Amino acid sequence: MNFPWDQLLVQGNWMITMGQIGAPFAVIAVIAVISYFKLWKYLYREWFTSIDHKKIGAMYLICAVLMFVRGGIDALMMRTQLAIPDNTFLEGNHYNEVFSTHGVIMIIFMAMPFIFGLWNVVVPLQIGARDVAFPVLNNVSFWLFFSGMILFNLSFIVGGSPAAGWTNYAPLAGEFSPGPGVNYYLIAIQISGIGTLMTGINFFVTILRCKTPTMKFMEMPMFTVTTFITALIVILAFPVLTVTLALFTTDRIFDTAFFSVANGGMPMLWANFFWVWGHPEVYIVILPAFGIYSEIIPTFARKRLFGHQSMVWATAGIAFLSFLVWVHHFFTMGNGALINSFFSISTMLIGIPTGVKIFNWLFTLYKGRVTFESPMLFALGFIPNFLIGGVTGVMLSMAAADYQYHNTYFLVAHFHYTLVAGVVFACLGALIFWWPKMTGFKLNETLNKWCFWLFMIGFNVCFIPQFILGLDGMPRRLYTYMPEDGWWLLNAISTVGALLMALGFMFLVASIVYSFFKAPREATGDNWDGLGRTLEWATAGAMPPKYNFAITPDWNDYDTFVDMKEHGRHYLDNHNYTDIHMPNNTPVGFWMGILFTIGGFFLIFETLVPAIICLIGIFATMVYRSFQIDHGYHIPASEVAETEKRLRDARIKEREAVSHES
């Protein structure tokens, strides 16, 4: 085994050196805290090996928030570098590493796990299910994502991060990027992507087979509809990424030539394959965000969602068109007028179903009794900001104009107005909105609103100047510029905006910490003053029991829960309980994740023998699980009845306390 020890440690940069020193101490500190409080057995039994969709969702969300912090630090480093001309805060290659990892982390390791975490927490509850269709696969999916996340973040201090951009274009990412950096990109995303594909299959089947029998597709909550359609996009798009990453991996490790011109390959093949996955990937994160807004807006407008069926068809239309627009990412690569014209038109067409959604949200607000809780503020802030992203997207869809905009900060501002205003606003609003379902208490509304206003104002202060910089000719991926370029003031303003966004997020962290210690614990499952409109708010307690629902709920309309409350069937009380079957926890996913991490690390450094041994271990684990007889366990009806009575008594006590105070 010839391990390249000379490539292991990155040298010559003080920030990376500090990371190399600090990371081991951070790991030791975490291990020490867990050991001091004797939590290892609890974490392993109740979390690491759990197949409970709610706990898996919480683990996804914890990782996503941590990656939001990591990606945000990358963004602040870039904005600090560009705040003044001729800055030496970051040297050129380090800047390239930072913006490359920023893009990958924010899309692959923040936005997607955030969405998947919400899927896990909310969707089974919304469809009246006890768990997902494949609970063990759900656990495996999480640990594969976690493995990819660990490997990708390890690159900063061990071996060096990828520096060819988040798109990793050949030939720059091929023969012109020696070392393990690009290998980290290929292997980490490959492992995480396999987990993502499993998640897509799991939720597609869950919604088809596990929803309450009376729930019809066109009557499902919009978040569930968008989850179903997004899961289908995942199933269709991610195999393309899997194959493409595998081909590039063989180029780098086994000297094949799929993407190398010198040996008969075609770099443009990578661009096509990448964006055949890459543009549907945008809708993998934005469609569930649309579903989130379709839950929040009717709740705080106290009104039915306007045009529910048209929203379903619009979602399906966007999903279909998402596979027909990938060439607009490289209009400038010389495809020819006919091809560019086709993809220009198909890109513009996406504005039609998206416009339908915008107007439906506005009509939902019209004559509604709107209240401005913090989730609603994020939803309302989304509409005008996302509209800016949409309008500039139509500008970029014109192939002739794209030649002017494409390689400038105008494009950077555009996609941040779609992804931040569309996805990040949704994630933050959803975290606050569904927080009581995970913890049993609400976050502090005052701090939440400070978070919203600082984040939204900072967002516009950060990215509106970038539109102007782009029109003035500032290229993207530029790590420094000269004073005579005249870009200093707008870059400085943009940096101030980024700092405001960071400050806003710190208010959300403060809200979480403050509420953990100070917020009253709630008993009701309908946490937002009884405004809930879907089944996740119909659980017997604020935090659903492990079986979710003691009896299978009925669902006859997308606002059935409102009707249930009007007729006094709010909590599905029933004394004819039966035994409930539940699956057992499993260690399979956890150990597969460890094997993927170790094997992936050795493959990144092109040390094949240990990687092959780990691969054999992975297959052995799968075989072991395949022959394991596990019938799960049953929760006795008496225990269900006792749990439901305890939760019912807590609700009554809480209601009496509120009545006494008023």
Swiss-Prot record:
Localization terms from the record: Cell membrane
Residues bound to Fe(II)-heme a: 102, 416
Cross-link (1'-histidyl-3'-tyrosine (His-Tyr)): 279-283
Catalysed reaction, written as an equation: 2 a quinol + O2 = 2 a quinone + 2 H2O
Pfam family, one: COX1
Cofactor binding note from Swiss-Prot or TrEMBL: Binds a copper B center.
Predominant location category: membrane
Chain residues that bind Cu cation: 279, 283, 328-329
Molecular-function GO term, any one: oxidoreductase activity, acting on diphenols and related substances as donors, oxygen as acceptor
Entry EC number(s): 1.10.3.-
Annotated transmembrane regions: 14-34, 56-76, 103-123, 140-160, 187-207, 228-248, 273-293, 311-331, 336-356, 376-396, 415-435, 451-471, 497-517, 587-604, 608-627
Superkingdom of this protein's organism: Bacteria
Membrane topology listed for this record: Multi-pass membrane protein
GO process annotations (BP): electron transport coupled proton transport; oxidative phosphorylation; respiratory electron transport chain
Binding-site positions, heme a3: 414
Required cofactor names: Cu cation; ferriheme a
Signal peptide residues on this chain, from the entry's feature table: none
Physiological role: Catalyzes quinol oxidation with the concomitant reduction of oxygen to water.
Protein name, as recorded: Probable quinol oxidase subunit 1
Species the sequence originates in: Staphylococcus saprophyticus subsp. saprophyticus (strain ATCC 15305 / DSM 20229 / NCIMB 8711 / NCTC 7292 / S-41)
